[in-house]
Amino acid sequence: MPQLVPFYFTNQIFYGFASLSVIVYLFSIYILPHYLEIYVTRIFITKT
């Protein structure tokens, strides 16, 4: 199992942080604003 070989630790840490950064960036740019717009619209509809 390459997960337990110390030679691969830095590679896994690097690609883990890189993929996590890409996921956070994509969520913050594309996915979360859409849900925020839906949430704000629902709040405005229920308060009037």
From Swiss-Prot:
Pfam families per the UniProt record, alphabetical: Fun_ATP-synt_8 (PF05933)
Primary subcellular site in the record, as a coarse category: mitochondrion
UniProt KW keywords: ATP synthesis, CF(0), Formylation, Hydrogen ion transport, Ion transport, Membrane, Mitochondrion, Mitochondrion inner membrane, Transmembrane, Transmembrane helix, Transport
Modified residues (N-formylmethionine): 1
Topology Mitochondrial matrix: residue spans: 33-48
GO biological process: proton motive force-driven ATP synthesis
Record InterPro entries: ATP_synth_su8_fun
Residues in the Mitochondrial intermembrane compartment per record: 1-12
GO MF, one annotated term: proton transmembrane transporter activity
Keyword ATP-binding belongs to the record: no
Membrane topology: Single-pass membrane protein
Regions that span the bilayer: 13-32
A single GO cellular-component term on record: mitochondrial inner membrane
Localisation per UniProt entry: Mitochondrion inner membrane
Family: Belongs to the ATPase protein 8 family.
Function: Mitochondrial membrane ATP synthase (F(1)F(0) ATP synthase or Complex V) produces ATP from ADP in the presence of a proton gradient across the membrane which is generated by electron transport complexes of the respiratory chain. F-type ATP synthases consist of two structural domains, F(1) - containing the extramembraneous catalytic core, and F(0) - containing the membrane proton channel, linked together by a central stalk and a peripheral stalk.
PANTHER family (UniProt xref): ATP SYNTHASE PROTEIN 8 (PTHR36101:SF1)
Subunit structure: F-type ATP synthases have 2 components, the catalytic core F(1) and the membrane-embedded component F(0), linked together by a central stalk and a peripheral stalk. The central stalk, also called rotor shaft, is often seen as part of F(1). The peripheral stalk is seen as part of F(0). F(0) contains the membrane channel next to the rotor. F-type ATP synthases form dimers but each monomer functions independently in ATP generation.
Protein name: ATP synthase protein 8
Originating organism: Yarrowia lipolytica (strain CLIB 122 / E 150)
Organism lineage string: Eukaryota, Fungi, Dikarya, Ascomycota, Saccharomycotina
